[in-house]
Regions:
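Binuclear metal-dependent hydrolase catalytic cores centered on His/Asp/Glu-rich metal-binding motifs
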Residues: 1-14
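Charged catalytic cores and adjacent phosphate/nucleic-acid-binding surfaces used
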Residues: 8, 16, 25-114
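Short, well-ordered beta-to-alpha junction loops that form the rim of enzyme active sites
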Residues: 21-22
């Protein structure tokens, strides 16, 4: 299935698509691919990426009116930088998370441990 068709299927089925670290560059990624009309949100804070990459993602999200998300991308303990979203109530299901994101009732954050 084509990636656009897959993303559309997720959204048509009630899911929410957030594009994680859209400007990440690595040897195993042949090119940066942006699909602003097929996603709902963009990860604008990734704790492991340089600020310029996060700033680029934030500008991308803003230019298309997309929701924003954040994450740590932490694959080991002892991370010095942590990112995520803060919500006002306890979430008990994926449906709760999707609802909070769609309503914009959250804030993204980045914490740096000294």
């Amino acid at each position: 299935m084509d990636v656009r068709a897959y993303l559309n299927l997720v959204r048509e089925s009630g899911g929410l698509v957030s594009h994680a670290h859209p400007f990440h560059e690595a040897g195993y990624i042949p090119y940066i691919r942006l699909l602003p009309h097929h996603v709902d949100a963009v990860e604008v804070i990734n704790a492991t990426k340089p600020p310029v990459v996060n700033e680029r993602a934030a500008a991308y999200a803003a230019s298309y009116g997309l929701l924003t998300t954040a994450g740590s991308d932490c694959h080991s303990s002892g991370a010095r930088r942590l990112g995520g979203i803060e919500v006002k109530r306890r979430l008990t299901s994926i449906g709760d998370l999707i609802g909070v994101l769609r309503q914009g009732d959250f804030r993204v954050f980045l914490n740096v441990k000294d």
